[in-house]
């Protein structure tokens, strides 16, 4: 399924990253790119941006370019607003287009379940609905960050809001069903990015296995993945 959605031409972000490095450095070296997708596509999880970030880091090493972190961040910002964050990881507040980052302490790793309904919402179409007004703006990012710093990810989840839920839920009942499936069971849940993936906060990994069984028993055809948060120290 994912392979059908991957583009292999010049519009692929991994190849765009290579071209951007060549343009910036004047390096004429080439590279054979083997792209193994593990992050679901069109899921609001930044998979394409992560590909670009990995390419920037890899090319800097393999071509021995010795680009500084600042140079990599600047190149990354030209590729996408998420790329600078994905070059560094951790926990950060994004301003501007999301490329201006202020880092804060990461909470301890927590287990998560990612649930992706079969709802297609192109990012551009989702952003096209935004009119600058949102209930989410009333949620203070300072409160969320404070909970993060106190290692209280549950309170951070419940204090957070995603504007795209307001914009997309009225026209996509499956998104509402998906979120309520988890919140009705007491799990803090929020849609990530422009959707449609739901991020479900767990207490222990066995809960994820139980939820996957319940999803199947309820007849929902959702992709679900078990993962956990990470800190900058966890990155290679």
Q: Where do the language-model regions lie?
A:
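N-terminal beta-alpha supersecondary unit
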Residues: 1-29, 40, 228-235
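Phosphate-handling active-site elements
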Residues: 23-32, 58-76, 204-219
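Short pre-catalytic strand/loop immediately N-terminal to key active-site residues, enriched for Gly-Thr
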Residues: 31-44, 186-189
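DPxDG-like acidic metal-binding loop motif
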Residues: 43-69, 85
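Conserved, helical-rich catalytic subdomain that frames metal- and/or nucleotide-binding sites
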Residues: 88, 93-188, 203-216, 220, ...
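Short hydrophobic/aromatic beta-strand micro-patches
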Residues: 199-201
């Amino acid at each position: 399924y994912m392979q059908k959605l991957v583009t292999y031409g010049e519009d692929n972000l991994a190849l765009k990253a290579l071209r951007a490095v060549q343009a910036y450095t004047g390096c004429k070296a080439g590279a054979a790119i083997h792209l193994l997708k593990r992050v679901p596509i069109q899921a609001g999880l930044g998979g394409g941006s992560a590909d670009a970030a990995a390419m920037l880091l890899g090319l800097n090493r393999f071509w021995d370019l010795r680009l500084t972190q600042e140079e990599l961040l600047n190149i990354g910002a030209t590729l996408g607003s998420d790329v600078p964050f994905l070059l560094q990881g951790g926990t950060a507040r994004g301003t501007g287009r999301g490329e201006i980052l202020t880092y804060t302490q990461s909470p301890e790793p927590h287990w998560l379940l990612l649930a992706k309904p079969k709802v297609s919402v192109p990012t551009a179409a989702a952003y096209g609905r935004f009119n600058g007004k949102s209930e989410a703006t009333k949620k203070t990012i300072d409160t969320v960050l404070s909970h993060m710093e106190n290692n209280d990810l549950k309170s951070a989840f419940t204090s957070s809001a995603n504007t795209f839920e307001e914009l997309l839920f009225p026209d996509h009942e499956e998104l509402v069903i998906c979120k309520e499936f988890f919140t009705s069971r007491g799990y803090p849940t929020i849609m990530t990015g422009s959707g449609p993936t739901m991020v479900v906060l767990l207490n222990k990994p066995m809960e994820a296995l139980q939820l996957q069984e319940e999803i199947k028993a309820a007849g929902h055809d959702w992709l679900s993945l078990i993962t956990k948060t990470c800190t900058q120290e966890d990155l290679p």
